[in-house]
Amino acid sequence: MAIKTEAYVDTSALIAFLDRSDSFHPLFRRLFSSPPPLVTSALVIAEGHGWFLRRYDRNRAIQFLNFIDDLSVLAFQPFDHEELTKTGRLVKKFGDQSLTMADAHGLVIINQRRIATCWSTDRHLGLTGAKLVISPEGP
């Protein structure tokens, strides 16, 4: 089966794009200027909202949600009991890593959808073989 052209987008990529002080901002600004179909976890949206709320304020957190609403190329994978079970298994499989549930759910999605490219600054998201856009080979 052919590898799909969609990419997985992690919290760190969303933050890097929206926060000009992030060292990866130029890379993600370029990538988001013409994005392929993107997919993410519902947990990533919760994590991103929380990051902007804690780091900045309610207004920036709402701006983050508005950006997500306007990002028409972004699809969401819900997080239900079945996803919790799969994600928990992966956290245990990589017990030597400090994986959050959001990161582990991202790995589950990457594997299920056979995604080859991951937009993330978090090297954990490459554990199962997806190419990170920050790697030397680049996007």
Report the location of each language-model feature.
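Active-site neighborhoods of divalent-metal-dependent phosphate/nucleic-acid chemistry enzymes
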Residues: A2-I3, L74-C118
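Conserved beta-strand segments of alpha/beta enzyme cores
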Residues: P37, V73-A75, K131-L132
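Short secondary-structure boundary segments
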Residues: A42-L43, D103, D122-R123
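Structured helix-beta-strand junction loops
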Residues: S34-P35, L71, Q97, T128
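Acidic, PIN/NYN-like endoribonuclease modules and their adjacent C-terminal/linker elements
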Residues: M1-K4, L107, Q112-P139
